[in-house]
């Protein structure tokens, strides 16, 4: 089911890493009984009004943007490019917002911030769940530092890429 809603997971070459990413998504979806249909209809952010981009669209789009960014850098700089671990970049892109499945809940047919989400934002819950599933620290770092919580940290190259593409998608809709 996860590969149906997030086919980009198949771009992770490392089968073990891929299966861990899928396991994180499966557990997060089970927490509140999230379905692909619901995740494909709720807005990707609650920090702006009248958001027409859905949660799944956002996750997929920023993942594709990360891949495209890495491809452009590789094409331009070849062997002079700062090394990017593509599997970690993709895994981090797919998991950065998975904590929103804990942060959000549906009330009267509308996505709202849950009591849990009022206390812990998605980077924290996302890291916790990914840690539980033994994701490597490089991926945990992307999840942890992708949003404002990571501004005081030194971001890895993969986290820098994800942070910027995520904010491109966010800033143009808010």
Regions found by a protein language model. Name each.
Residues 27-28, 56, 125-129, 135:
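Generic detector of short, locally flexible boundary/turn motifs and exposed helical patches
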């Amino acid at each position: 089911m996860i590969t149906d809603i997030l086919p980009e997971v198949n771009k992770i070459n490392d089968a073990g890493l891929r299966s861990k990413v899928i396991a994180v998504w499966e557990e997060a979806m089970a927490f509140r009984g999230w379905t692909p249909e619901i995740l494909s209809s709720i807005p990707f952010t609650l920090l702006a009004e009248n958001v027409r981009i859905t949660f799944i669209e956002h996750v997929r789009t920023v993942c594709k943007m990360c891949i495209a960014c890495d491809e452009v850098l590789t094409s331009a700089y070849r062997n002079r490019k700062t090394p990017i671990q593509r599997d970690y970049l993709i895994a981090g892109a797919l998991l950065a917002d998975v904590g929103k499945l804990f942060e959000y809940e549906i009330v009267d047919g509308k996505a709202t911030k849950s009591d849990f989400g009022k206390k812990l934002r998605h980077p924290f819950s996302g890291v916790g769940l990914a840690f539980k599933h033994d994701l490597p620290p490089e991926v945990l770092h992307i999840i942890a530092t992708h949003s404002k919580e990571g501004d005081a940290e030194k971001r890895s190259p993969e986290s820098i890429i994800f942070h910027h593409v995520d904010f491109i998608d966010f800033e143009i809709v808010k």
